[in-house]
Design a protein with these regions (language model features):
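Short alpha-helical basic/polar micro-motif
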Residues: 96, 238, 242, 320
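Ferredoxin-type iron-sulfur electron-transfer modules in oxidoreductases and energy-metabolism complexes
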Residues: 211-232, 250-343
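Non-catalytic, usually N-terminal nucleic-acid engagement modules in DNA/RNA processing proteins
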Residues: 2, 12-111, 117, 121
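Glycine-rich anion-binding loop/nest that anchors nucleotide
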Residues: 95-97, 133, 316
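Catalytic cores of enzyme domains
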Residues: 101-237, 241-272
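N-terminal basic/disordered segments at the start of proteins
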Residues: 7-11
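A short Gly-Trp-Pro
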Residues: 18, 22, 55-63, 67-77, ...
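Short, flexible loop segments at the rims of nucleotide/cofactor-binding pockets, characterized by
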Residues: 2-4, 219-220
Length: 343
């Protein structure tokens, strides 16, 4: 699979060529809202260079509100409809590599272990993912501390590197090679490959924290005092979960309108008090301390035990957006540092 170059002034032609064969999904700004991953429409100008803050690909693969079943009892008989996403080939562009890796975490939840979510699977099965490494790394990233990021490339179909006036297009699968074969792409020169490698090394070294990857799931402690410290600051707004590209907690709700009942899936978070409230009234997590502990131990220990992947990809959104400045990097440094393990 040969690496390619795409000049930025050829991107509109590249997108048009993609749109002729695929439904193209990319971050789009509409109005004053942050860029969201949407299926491109005529007149859209997608942000595919990773230069701006954006919502996550999760919002496309696992919508914030999705009707799963409709039941209508009009006329005395019940009709049942299960609205499914369209079955069509898609290409996703403009996802930061940490966000693209987060799709792998979602895959473990919704496609593995003998359970397949048909709604998620329909969007995912014909989706080619093209990740992006931007020209400048975000200050909040800490990807290199979490995993062997070298392996992340194998989990996407191609990686685009922003080299200023052009993108370096590196296919990593047969799907990616098919995209690279589009006529707008040219063969990469050795100097371009060197520039790409420099950018890749910058990405891998961004936000390195003082602990080894294994420490994430070996050094977390149930009784660590840090959980109470987090809980004292946390206001349980749920932002860290809702903006996380890999958090997948959801709730099921029924809504009645006349003779029609819709059952839909919507966002939820383990940081809300009623998340673990049971039907008979018992709640095993009545304070914020166990809820704060659950979220981090689930992401960094339990998901690794269950699926073999860490449930965080270091995208830094929770660092940037937490209203009370709980910095997960500081928490991990305190709980997982190799110095602590050796003491």
């Amino acid at each position: 699979m040969a690496d390619k170059l795409i000049s930025k002034d050829k991107i509109p032609d590249f997108l048009a060529a993609l749109a002729a064969e695929y439904t193209v999904v990319a971050p789009v700004e509409r109005g004053d809202a942050p860029a969201e991953f949407k299926e491109l429409e005529a007149g859209d100008t997608p942000i595919i260079d990773g230069s701006k803050a954006m919502m996550t690909p999760k919002d496309y693969l696992l919508p914030r509100h999705e009707v799963l079943v409709k039941i209508d009892t009009a006329g005395g008989s019940a009709s049942i409809e299960t609205p499914m996403p369209e079955d069509k080939p898609r290409v996703m562009l403009g996802a930061w590599l940490p966000d693209a890796q987060a799709i792998q975490v979602l895959d473990r939840v919704f496609l593995d272990k003998g359970f397949v979510d048909p709604y998620y699977a329909r969007r995912r099965e014909k989706l080619a993912v093209v990740a992006v490494i931007p020209a400048e790394m975000r200050w909040s990233w800490f990807c290199g501390s979490l995993d062997d990021v070298e392996t992340w490339k194998a989990n996407v179909d191609a990686v685009m590197y922003d080299l200023g006036d052009k993108f370096y297009f590196e296919p990593t699968s047969e799907k990616g090679a098919a995209l690279a074969a589009l006529r707008q792409a040219q063969d990469a020169a050795e100097s371009d490959t060197i520039a790409k490698n420099v950018l890749w090394e910058q990405f891998k070294s961004t936000g390195i924290l003082p602990f080894a990857g294994k420490a994430l799931y070996e050094n977390l402690a149930w009784e660590d005092p840090v959980w109470e410290e987090i809980a004292q600051k946390c206001i349980a707004c749920g932002m860290c979960s809702f903006m996380c590209p890999s958090c997948s907690c959801f709730d099921m709700q029924d809504e009645t309108r006349g003779t029609c009942v819709e059952r839909y899936r919507c966002r939820d978070t383990c940081q809300f008090e009623d998340f673990t409230l049971m039907g008979h009234g018992h709640n095993p997590r009545t304070t914020q301390i166990p809820r704060s502990r659950q979220r981090l131990m689930h992401k960094f220990m339990y998901q690794h035990q269950q699926f073999g992947v860490v449930g965080c990809t270091g995208c830094g959104r929770c660092v940037e957006l937490c209203p009370v400045n709980v910095d997960i990097r500081d928490v991990l440094t305190r709980t997982c540092s190799t110095e602590k393990a050796e003491s």
